[in-house]
């Protein structure tokens, strides 16, 4: 869960983080569009830092991971804050359960 990730964050280089967040934003919007989600977003800012290991694992792995329930709407690249939406978190959890059904 997010709290355990936040307790022991490993900072990553700014350039890598910028590219990573940009890719993550694109990936999540694409997934949400495929899920047929539409509606207003009420984002809540949550500070998140990614470790180098998570970045190397790839965007798909990160997004579909049960351990990190994260959905990306906007990014504040200067502070490294991610903006999460409760509505999209629900959509993301549905996508993960679909993904698990496909894998099993």
Swiss-Prot record:
Q: Where in the cell does this protein reside?
A: Mitochondrion
Q: What is its main location?
A: mitochondrion
Q: Taxonomically, which superkingdom?
A: Eukaryota
Kindly indicate whether the keyword Mitochondrion belongs to this entry.
yes
Q: Which keywords does the record carry?
A: Mitochondrion, Plasmid
The record's GO CC annotations read:
mitochondrion
Name-wise, this protein is Uncharacterized 11.8 kDa protein
Q: Which organism is it from?
A: Claviceps purpurea (Ergot fungus)
Could you read off the lineage of the organism from its UniProt record? Eukaryota, Fungi, Dikarya, Ascomycota, Pezizomycotina
């Amino acid at each position: 869960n997010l709290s355990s990730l936040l307790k022991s964050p490993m900072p990553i280089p700014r350039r890598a983080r910028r590219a990573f967040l940009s890719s993550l934003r694109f990936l999540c919007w694409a997934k949400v569009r495929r899920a047929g989600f539409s509606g207003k977003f009420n984002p809540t800012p949550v500070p998140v830092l990614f470790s180098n290991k998570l970045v190397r694992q790839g965007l798909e792995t990160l997004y579909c991971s049960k351990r990190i329930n994260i959905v990306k709407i906007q990014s504040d690249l200067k502070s490294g804050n991610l903006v999460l939406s409760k509505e999209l978190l629900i959509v993301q959890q549905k996508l993960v359960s679909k993904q698990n059904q496909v894998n099993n």
